[in-house]
Swiss-Prot record:
It is an enzyme of class 5 (isomerase). PANTHER family: METHYLTHIORIBOSE-1-PHOSPHATE ISOMERASE. It comes from Desulfatibacillum aliphaticivorans. Substrate binds at residues 54-56, 95, 208, 259-260. The gene is mtnA. Coiled coil: none annotated. Pathway: Amino-acid biosynthesis; L-methionine biosynthesis via salvage pathway; L-methionine from S-methyl-5-thio-alpha-D-ribose 1-phosphate: step 1/6. This is Methylthioribose-1-phosphate isomerase.
Amino acid sequence: MNVNGKWYRAIWPNEHDPETVEIIDQRKLPHRFEIVGLTTVKKTIQAIRDMYVRGAPLIGATGAWGVYLAVVNMKDAENPLQYLKEECFKISNARPTAVNLEWAVKAMEAAILEKSNVEDWIKAAWSKAIEITEAEVKNCRQIGVHGSPLIEEISKNKNGKTVNILTHCNAGWLACVDHGTATAPIYAAFDKGIDVHVWVDETRPLNQGSRLTAWELGQHGVPHTIITDNAGGHLMQHGKVDMVIVGTDRTTHTGDVANKVGTYLKALAAKDNNVPFYVALPSSTIDWEMKNGVKDIPIENRDPDEVRKVWGLHDGHLVDVLVPPEESPALNVAFDVTPARLVTGLITERGLCKASEEGVRSLFPDKMK
């Protein structure tokens, strides 16, 4: 996508140094645009854990490139196979909720172990990492193709008046290599000339909505307004939201959706106000084994200081500011689970389906057990 008129993806191999993978340091956005080079597994894990990169599809792609870097750096390993398995385990456990990470690492490991020597391992790792990255880009593009008609239909029903879409957190190209999941239908509709406006939840505590979604929508020229996390229900009650589109970090094959904490409350408000609530996702985000999302999806708890402090630009410097009493504790639950019954539909690379086991099976019979 465009950044000040130049095309970028959220992760890419350095064109001059094949042993370096480059990412955008999303912690600094929107006030600083900085590119960071990853050269080791340790740096890759740090980038995932400390949220230089975030968003399920991008975490998966980053994990894939991390495995590639593990193979590149295994030249001095006494037992290459043991080394590979240990590094893959470390990468898989960098963050617990997004299923894409574990899926991508397993796919990388399987592709590598089909080969018999380290030199071929490097070639296989490079090819598979490229394949995984390009697949995510293609899938997100298709999500836009299948999701934009929903926006077009609302526009027709409103006689061309503005379609107001609410989204939570950042499920844009910054989270997905390119295009995004929740934003893919929005970009596709906007590029067709449909009058759209996006309500952007600020998404505390790290403000991925106000920092990232607002920034990338602005770069694309999409009209948007940042709102507090608790304003969505009020807007729905007064007819100012036509639809909700969010992303997901893990969705069970039965349709339960884990996404940034606060998503569940948006779904409840949408249900109460008859506002369609859609979840956009590539199939790499579907957990094909898990059935009960509320009970079984692992939910990450992050540093309480992310809740206690706010981050921003002050006098040209990026600073953290303590808000509550210093002695007050905080709980930082990073995700929640929206039950399938609250989801109007899933938007995937193969089309739309109900948020149910039968619905998912209708699009992905080859992946269901």
